[in-house]
């Protein structure tokens, strides 16, 4: 189970630590080039969900589970038509209290937030690359904004191949073998 430790401010000498347990990872975003996850805390309502930097978390299994679902959702969005019919939605069996309605609206809004190429922005450059659940992902910087998103490399290869090539060219290095260096020295000594 995921955990996050928080020291209480009122403890002077004993430094008591309070541990929060992550129940579920709900969403992912990039803020100033750092990955943050929206977390549902065990024993707390959805109004207490918080965005936390990846480096502060100790729940790799939950993050991995979320990324698998996130990846499937992304691939599904690319293959399915955008519009959904109202007739296919199920009604909830729970009561529609004010809290239920608010939390449902929050979930719908967070799911409606466009990410990556869905935002319709023009890619400027690739800042970095990472492996996420076995898939290569690029951190894409967009033109006319300071924001960046993780996008599937497969998608970037199709939508902006020249930017992908530029990213690889910037990082391309040539390594000479020792025999090559010796041969060049011999040739220059003969001249």
From Swiss-Prot:
Residues 73-89 have a biased composition (Basic and acidic residues). Its main location: nucleus. InterPro entries: Chromo-like_dom_sf (IPR016197), Chromo/chromo_shadow_dom (IPR000953), Chromo_dom_subgr (IPR017984), Chromo_domain (IPR023780), Chromo_shadow_dom (IPR008251), Chromodomain_CS (IPR023779), Heterochromatin_chromo-domain (IPR051219). One of its GO terms (biological process) is negative regulation of DNA-templated transcription. GO terms for cellular component: chromocenter; chromosome, telomeric region; heterochromatin; histone deacetylase complex; histone methyltransferase complex; kinetochore; nucleolus; nucleoplasm. Keywords: Acetylation, Centromere, Chromosome, Isopeptide bond, Nucleus, Phosphoprotein, Repeat, Ubl conjugation. The keyword Transcription does not apply. It is found in: Nucleus; Chromosome; Chromosome, Centromere. There is a cross-link at residues 32, 91, 102, 106, 154, 184 (Glycyl lysine isopeptide (Lys-Gly) (interchain with G-Cter in SUMO2)). The modification Phosphoserine is found at residues 11-14, 92-93, 95, 97. GO terms for molecular function: chromatin binding; DNA-binding transcription factor binding; histone deacetylase binding; histone H3K9me2/3 reader activity; histone reader activity; identical protein binding; methylated histone binding; protein-containing complex binding. Residues 1-21, 70-117 are annotated as: Disordered. Homodimer. Interacts with histone H3 methylated at 'Lys-9'. Interacts (via Chromo 2; shadow subtype domain) with the MIS12 complex subunit NSL1; the interaction is direct, involves dimeric CBX5, and occurs during interphase. Interacts with POGZ; POGZ and PXVXL motif-containing proteins such as INCENP and TRIM28 compete for interaction with CBX5. Interacts with LRIF1 (via PxVxL motif). Interacts with INCENP. Interacts with TRIM24. Interacts (via the chromoshadow domain) with ATRX; the interaction is direct. Interacts (via the chromoshadow domain) with CHAF1A; the interaction is direct. Component of heterochromatin that recognizes and binds histone H3 tails methylated at 'Lys-9' (H3K9me), leading to epigenetic repression. In contrast, it is excluded from chromatin when 'Tyr-41' of histone H3 is phosphorylated (H3Y41ph). May contribute to the association of heterochromatin with the inner nuclear membrane by interactions with the lamin-B receptor (LBR). Involved in the formation of kinetochore through interaction with the MIS12 complex subunit NSL1. Required for the formation of the inner centromere. Component of heterochromatin that recognizes and binds histone H3 tails methylated at 'Lys-9' (H3K9me), leading to epigenetic repression. In contrast, it is excluded from chromatin when 'Tyr-41' of histone H3 is phosphorylated (H3Y41ph). Can interact with lamin-B receptor (LBR). This interaction can contribute to the association of the heterochromatin with the inner nuclear membrane. Involved in the formation of functional kinetochore through interaction with MIS12 complex proteins. This is Chromobox protein homolog 5. It comes from Mus musculus. The gene is Cbx5.
